[in-house]
């Protein structure tokens, strides 16, 4: 069960945060791409309640090797295995937005460091899903997740200076089903292009980056929101 929350104080909220804290009322049975990537189901594990038996059965626990964003890895573990997941729109918590000087506040504006931490999160998810062969069965979904978590923001915020992030991604994907041509041919063209660029450690040109971002935004959010994001990116807005 995953519920909603309010940013606290309310004026500290921003578009992305307000959206992800506002799930709709819906239930999913079994594995669902929509639950993982289309709904406002992530991040923030404190708004998700799980049965103890479920967690014990699948040996799901927090990965203590991750110092930043461990809730992303935990939620990918539970949503990837859950037989039934319900999202409710009720806003049951007030979430204090990052305090000045906190880890989350520090990371928010250190783009490369934050994205390298996101690569560590992705590596943990990949290892966890490998336990039950979920990485083989859903390699194309994990490629989408890589773009969502790392690659889109790498080209949006770092542009042609994303080499260190791409190098870290290439290392994580070495030998993985996610980086295989068999998986990438099943992906949307924008997803496959971003993953291939990371594997080759070759940042696209500025024009190609803008085109990739727009195509990916259409894929994940629809044409109208993609146009809004494109305008926001051109204006240099970070929180879109």
Spans of features found by a protein language model:
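C-terminal, non-catalytic tails of nucleotide-sugar-dependent glycosyltransferases
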Residues: 116-141
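Amphipathic alpha-helical repeat scaffolds of TPR domains
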Residues: 143-153
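Secondary-structure edge/capping motif, primarily at the C-terminal ends of alpha-helices
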Residues: 129-133, 156-161
């Amino acid at each position: 069960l995953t519920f909603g929350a309010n940013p606290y104080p309310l004026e500290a909220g921003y578009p992305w945060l307000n959206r992800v804290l506002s799930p709709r009322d819906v239930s999913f049975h079994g594995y669902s791409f929509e639950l993982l990537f289309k709904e406002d189901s992530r991040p923030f594990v404190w708004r998700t309640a799980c049965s103890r038996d479920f967690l014990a059965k699948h040996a799901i626990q927090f990965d203590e090797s991750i110092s930043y964003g461990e809730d992303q890895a935990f939620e990918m573990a539970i949503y990837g295995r859950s037989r039934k997941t319900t999202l409710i729109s009720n806003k049951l918590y007030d979430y204090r937005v990052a305090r000045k000087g906190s880890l989350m506040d520090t990371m928010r504006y250190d783009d490369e460091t934050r994205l390298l931490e996101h690569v560590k999160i992705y590596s943990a998810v990949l290892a966890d899903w490998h336990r039950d062969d979920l990485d083989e069965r859903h390699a194309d979904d994990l490629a989408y997740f890589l773009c969502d978590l790392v690659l889109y923001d790498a080209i949006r915020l770092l542009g042609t200076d994303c080499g260190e992030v791409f190098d870290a991604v290439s290392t994580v994907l070495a030998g993985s089903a996610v980086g295989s041509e068999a998986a990438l041919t099943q992906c949307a063209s924008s997803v496959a292009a971003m993953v291939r660029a990371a594997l080759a450690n070759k940042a696209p040109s500025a024009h190609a980056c803008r085109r990739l971002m727009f195509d990916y935004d259409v894929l994940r959010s629809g044409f109208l929101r993609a146009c809004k994001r494109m305008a926001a990116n051109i204006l240099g807005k970070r929180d879109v």
